[in-house]
Amino acid sequence: MLEADFVIIGSGSAGSAMAYRLSEDGKHSVIVIEFGGSDIGPLIQMPSALSIPLNMSLYDWGFASEPEPHLGGRVLATPRGKVIGGSSSINGMVYVRGHARDFDHWAEEGATGWGFADVLPYFKRMEDNDGGEDGWRGHGGPLHVQRGSRKNPLYGAFVEAGRQAGFELTDDYNGSKQEGFGPMEQTISGGRRWSAASAYLKPALKRKNVSLVKGFARRVIIENQRAIGVEIEAHKQIQVVKARREVIVAASSINSPKILMLSGIGPAEHLRENGIAVVADRPGVGRNLQDHMELYIQQESTKPITLNSVLNPFSKALIGAQWLFFKSGLGATNHFEAAAFVRSRAGVDYPDIQYHFIPAAVRYDGKAAAKSHGFQAHVGPMRSKSRGSVTLRSPDPKAKPVIRFNYMSHPDDWTEFRHCIRLTREIFGQSAFDAFRGQEISPGSHVQSDDDLDVFIRDHAESAYHPCGTCKMGRADDVTSVVDPECRVIGVDGLRVADSSIFPRVTNGNLNAPSIMTGEKASDHILGRTPLAPSNQEPWINPRWQVSDR
């Protein structure tokens, strides 16, 4: 029988970090259960190939939403990594911690000990920041963070246009000042994707006390209200991986609630409907699903300097060859090298809109490239009020769950997205883009009225692939909480959840960084260590926030 002190389900952002930290002192054995295969190969390791694994069943679980009623019945893909490193091996390699206020809101909502002062030391501990170490940034940690070269002049035009429009500039949105236009950070090292597997799991697996077990996690085995192991399917056989101390679920915001429900933890009525014996009635399991949505605002470029010139087989082959032999060139970046975090209106105290800018006009998944040279901004609101759910389709562990995001179900979502479109047009209309600006490709200059913008939003808004919140962390006496502030599943001993599913609220940006931080901090709770000393750093808040949006 396979057996270890700690059994972790999932080798993603949080799971890999926990495998590394729980085994670090050599006193405890760790087994990581992962259904996916190897991350070796250029399709994952070459940063510019980022859209390819998203569309491959080899690396992606292939989840999709139910038809979304507020998006004309569209079904939206929900990629989650089915590979060593989890979603950190198929994501966009964008590194965003989130705003300090995000974590303070977590604490206010019952996640005591997870305010910004508490989590900043863990962000610092995990970082190997190219820019060095200070009160805000870390250096020497497992996760390499860099900035792109920003050689293409369109990156500079985007940042300058933000300044011309009256917005702030920021040299480090992961430092004291998130608000503003500036460089974007990447989890890339030496021209390669630097996933959680590269940073944490592979170094951990070199230790004698860490093992990786390839298998499909069916459920957590619970006896007398205590988790004692995990039932897996491996080599077409059902096996048990026994946990001497604890089981930690880190299987993503989609799979983590599914595994809990299959184990008898969740809304009692829903479990009974599926013929599952109730171990712990936790109504919050699978609820509180959140995500970011975004639109692509695309503009023709009058100069042939965009990436559209290399979106052909011959150019891709040359780029691939240069990357393969030298780990350099256009293949060695994700091309997200300029960013912005801005506030939508006066009275909003910290940014609620995020921009990714790239010198190309093409969908994030690599499809539907524009016919001409172009550039685009990915833009979307960061704090949607819409909430969704993940439920069981059947008691069969192999059945994909029912995912209902309820995108755009709150009226404010529509107001915010209309503003995002109009604001992007204002930015692209600044003189910094005069030398490059052609016709608007998308939505198109004819799309102006609220009604027309709403049609465009309904037909074209996409997930930014940041699902979270389905095993919410909070007070033990809150019926909507699934785990307490030490990541312990309420009502079951020896069982924790630690990944993006425990976020009470979605953070202000991409989720890889806060997911890794969650694994880092959860490890100290699991080991019974005193948490790292809180920081006394104070974030920059725009002094004009009450009277101006910039």
Swiss-Prot record:
Enzyme class: oxidoreductase
Catalytic activity, EC: 1.1.99.1, 1.2.1.8
Cofactors: FAD
Disordered, as annotated region: 529-550
Any one Pfam family match given in the protein's UniProt record, by short name: GMC_oxred_C
SUPFAM superfamilies: FAD-linked reductases, C-terminal domain, FAD/NAD(P)-binding domain
UniProt-annotated catalytic positions: H466
One MF term in the entry's GO annotations: choline dehydrogenase activity
Record-listed FAD binding positions: 5-34
Pathway entry: Amine and polyamine biosynthesis; betaine biosynthesis via choline pathway; betaine aldehyde from choline (cytochrome c reductase route): step 1/1
GO biological process: one example: glycine betaine biosynthetic process from choline
Catalyzed reactions: choline + A = betaine aldehyde + AH2; betaine aldehyde + NAD(+) + H2O = glycine betaine + NADH + 2 H(+)
Keywords: FAD, Flavoprotein, NAD, Oxidoreductase
Role: Involved in the biosynthesis of the osmoprotectant glycine betaine. Catalyzes the oxidation of choline to betaine aldehyde and betaine aldehyde to glycine betaine at the same rate.
PANTHER family according to UniProt: CHOLINE DEHYDROGENASE, MITOCHONDRIAL, GLUCOSE-METHANOL-CHOLINE GMC OXIDOREDUCTASE
HAMAP family, per database record: Choline_dehydrogen
Name of this protein: Oxygen-dependent choline dehydrogenase
Organism annotation: Mesorhizobium japonicum (strain LMG 29417 / CECT 9101 / MAFF 303099)
Highest classification ranks of the organism: Bacteria, Pseudomonadati, Pseudomonadota, Alphaproteobacteria, Hyphomicrobiales
Gene name for this UniProt entry: betA
